[in-house]
Amino acid sequence: MPADTLIGEEGRTLNKLYTLITNNELVKERYGAYGKELNVEYLEDAGCLDVLIKARDAIHGGSRLETHPMAGSIKPNQNPYKTVMISDGKVDPEEFQEFITVMENSIMTCRKFLMEKPLPEWEEKLKKDFRYIDQSLIESAVSRI
């Protein structure tokens, strides 16, 4: 599955509720008041791993994974910001298993990279660039809802 595409986009309907789970305040500011079909769940002071775990837990609760959590081929120990889109769309058992597998693999990959080389304390200018990169990765998915 391509990392930058919506998952199951052929099954989307206009009345779905989408949620961005993010630790990126730039995403919160940009999409926080986007409209009634899009919510932002902002995890302040959270890391990438926290975002992935929150998204996985939401999928266990019945949410649909709409974007690949490792989009952009950016290693988890390179960018401290992460945004994942989920929705309340219908999930069949095969999709559920696929979504959980994607999330568990992403969590394992994130843990592996962070254990090998923890995130450095980036200066604010670099953090700003990383926030922008993360936001740009989610823009194409948001533009399709």
Give residue ranges: language-model regions.
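Rossmann-fold NAD(P)-binding glycine/threonine-rich loop
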Residues: K28-Y34, L43-G61, H68, K82, ...
